[in-house]
């Protein structure tokens, strides 16, 4: 677990421009044979809000994230999302064009392994630029300028723009993946163990950068992590999962400082395995 000193005050959530939820999960469930990986999960996420989903390995948090982000079809329940026109749509009822819009424009997904979210053999500039081209930009000079600006924003020197991610360190790859996701100014970003596998010093630097970007851009985010320091630094609310169920939820500081459930108390005490 990342050992960093943090303020006891959670990030300040911006007042949402719309009082309707951005994303709604209703009674989500998924089973594999007799194994219930996720059971009866419901919650609402508002604009500018960051939700952390925490729990040990096998608790169901990654399965839940895949369903929320449209990568896995729920066995039961539904996921709804408020589109830019203000209309809330069920993901399962969206056409291909609407889903493509979400994945290219409105959503980002930061993988634990940057190689899953990057093209490792092409340049860093191309990794960022191709997402811009996917949303209709076609002026090479402007695309390169935007890519350069975003590399610098995630603390990657502009003189590395033509280098492939395979030449980058692990921390640089993760920062590049974040730039690739945020360059189109999505409204919602999904993060799956974004600091996993990184050295402690690299994790702390990455978390500080992520917290700044989330605040500056007013992003909504859903972050899956087993590291409670990540949850405390980034999230406004936290959901604790055990055995596929949400067993405790609330404001991050309240849950982590005064957990009610015995499982959450063990998790906070770092007794449970990652």
Regions found by a protein language model. Name each.
Residues 249-250:
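ABC ATPase "signature
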Residues 69:
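Helix-to-loop junction immediately C-terminal to a conserved catalytic motif
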Residues 142-159, 268-269:
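Conserved ABC ATPase "signature" region
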Residues 54-56:
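The feature captures the beta-strand-to-loop junction immediately N-terminal to the Walker
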Residues 164-168, 172:
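Conserved ABC ATPase signature
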């Amino acid at each position: 677990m990342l050992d960093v000193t943090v303020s006891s005050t959670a990030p300040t959530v911006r007042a949402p421009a719309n009082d309707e939820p951005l994303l709604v999960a209703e009674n989500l469930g998924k089973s594999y044979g007799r194994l219930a990986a996720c059971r009866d999960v419901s919650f609402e996420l508002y604009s500018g809000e960051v939700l952390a989903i925490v729990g040990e390995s096998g608790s169901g948090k990654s399965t839940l994230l895949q369903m929320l982000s449209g990568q896995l079809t729920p066995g039961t329940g539904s996921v709804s999302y408020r589109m830019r026109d203000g209309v809330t749509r069920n993901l399962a009822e969206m056409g291909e064009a609407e889903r493509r819009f979400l994945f290219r424009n409105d959503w980002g997904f930061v993988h634990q392994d940057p190689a899953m979210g990057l093209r490792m053999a092409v340049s860093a500039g191309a990794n960022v630029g191709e997402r811009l081209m996917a949303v209709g930009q076609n002026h090479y000079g402007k695309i390169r300028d935007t890519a350069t600006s975003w590399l610098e924003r995630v603390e990657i020197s502009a003189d590395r723009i033509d280098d492939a991610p395979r030449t980058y360190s692990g921390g640089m790859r993760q920062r590049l993946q974040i730039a690739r996701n945020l360059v189109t100014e999505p409204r919602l970003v999904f993060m799956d163990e974004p600091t996993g596998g990184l050295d402690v010093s690299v994790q702390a630097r990455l978390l500080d950068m992520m917290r700044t970007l989330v605040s500056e851009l007013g992003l909504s985010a859903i972050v899956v992590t087993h590291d409670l320091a990540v949850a405390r630094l980034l999230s406004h609310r936290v959901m604790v999962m055990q055995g596929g169920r949400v067993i405790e939820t609330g404001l991050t500081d309240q849950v982590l400082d005064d957990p009610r459930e015995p499982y959450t108390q063990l998790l906070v005490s770092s007794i449970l395995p990652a």
